[in-house]
Amino acid sequence: MKKQSTKRTVKRRTPRRKAAAPNREPSVIPMLSYEDGIAALEWLAKAFGFREKTRLMGPNGRLAHGEMAAGDGLIMLASLLPDYQSPKHHREVCEQARKWSRVPWIIDGVLVYVDDLDRHFKRAKAAGATILSEIEEGPPGRRYRAEDLEGHRWFFFEKEDG
């Protein structure tokens, strides 16, 4: 009797994106804190083309809850705590954070699919995004990496046809 192999081969390919059902919230929604949530809402719209959906202010005059649409996805953000340190600010005072930030990959961050990667890249660069990698091609697909105004990391992929 021939013994079956339990070894599996994993084929790498560009990540596939499945659209959310109409009128349904995405299954996963990243939630990010910002020192200045209002500035973040405006900057993310300008640099990355996200669309502001919700802006709720807290009694302290800070952003209590914000929502931005990115394609059929959603990103939530807030700036409730006055002593919160953004990744960028944290790197200024912490050697471990500075060491981590020298790694160009996205260790903690958000992956976003876009229709036109070249146009998106130019827009982000013109708005002052910190570009961590120019547009790269090859497995797992066309992509680039960037940081926003407060040092949060973003990974942008071009949508596949089909």
Residue ranges and their predicted role:
Residues 2-32, 41-42, 48-149, 156-162:
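Vicinal oxygen chelate
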Residues 34-36:
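Conserved beta-strand-loop-alpha-helix junction that forms the acyl-donor binding cleft
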